[in-house]
């Protein structure tokens, strides 16, 4: 295999603990909107709904604005809350998502260790308002070389169109010299395969992968990315 010259990092669930940010943001918004207590059971219910809506986006069934509001509309209807509050709730939620910054284990150390050795980019399907705040508050916007947010790019992972500006920006680095690291099989790994990029599935939970998806690497600890990069240079 070719030497890895660029690492493309997914953000939510790979570099940053999305579930921690999600939990804090929802609880804050429930309080701000006077919706009462948001229990852990309610957050788990919302999280499952949210995953389904994002997967529908990846399949091209809805637009980004539709899924952002639709997930809360469905959740509120299921909880007996007026769904009409969903648009305003989502707008505040996007702002609050960047309030809580928790790095996934060894993510910060790995990004720091790779600085100057390979090009490092964020490749994320999140919204611009949420991701800009997260990247700034975490310091990742100053550690990574380039940032690619689907809302700005105009395409979502796993679409090959998402990666077109990534390739253009990285110039002489070939797709096979890039490694995409992410926790999502449907957006990160499928996206990397679609674009001809080497793939690394971050799988800390030890989940089974579907046989039709053949990723190049599977890791349980982000620190393993450093080993993969070093091994490729030998």
Feature-to-residue mapping (PLM):
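Structured helix-beta-strand junction loops
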Residues: 49, 116-117
């Amino acid at each position: 295999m070719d030497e890895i010259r660029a690492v493309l990092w997914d953000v939510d669930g790979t570099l940053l603990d999305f579930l921690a940010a999600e939990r804090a943001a929802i609880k804050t918004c429930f309080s701000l909107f006077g919706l009462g207590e948001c229990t852990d059971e309610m957050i788990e219910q919302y999280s499952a709904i949210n995953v389904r809506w994002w997967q529908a986006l990846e399949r091209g069934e809805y637009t980004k604005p539709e899924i952002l509001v639709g997930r809360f509309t469905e959740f509120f209807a299921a909880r007996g809350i007026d769904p009409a509050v969903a648009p305003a709730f989502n707008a505040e939620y996007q702002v609050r998502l960047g309030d809580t910054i928790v790095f996934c284990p060894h993510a910060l150390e790995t990004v720091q260790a790779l600085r100057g050795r390979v090009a490092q980019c964020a490749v994320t399907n999140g919204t611009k308002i949420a991701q800009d705040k997260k990247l700034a508050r975490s310091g990742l916007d100053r550690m990574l070389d380039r940032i690619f947010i689907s809302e700005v790019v105009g395409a979502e992972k796993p679409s090959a169109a998402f990666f077109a500006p990534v390739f253009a920006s990285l110039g002489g680095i070939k797709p096979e010299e890039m490694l995409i690291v992410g926790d999502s099989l449907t957006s990160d790994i499928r996206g990397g395969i679609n674009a001809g990029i080497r793939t690394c599935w971050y799988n800390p939970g030890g989940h089974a992968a579907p046989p039709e998806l053949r990723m190049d690497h599977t890791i349980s600890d982000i620190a393993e990315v450093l080993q993969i990069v070093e091994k490729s240079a030998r």
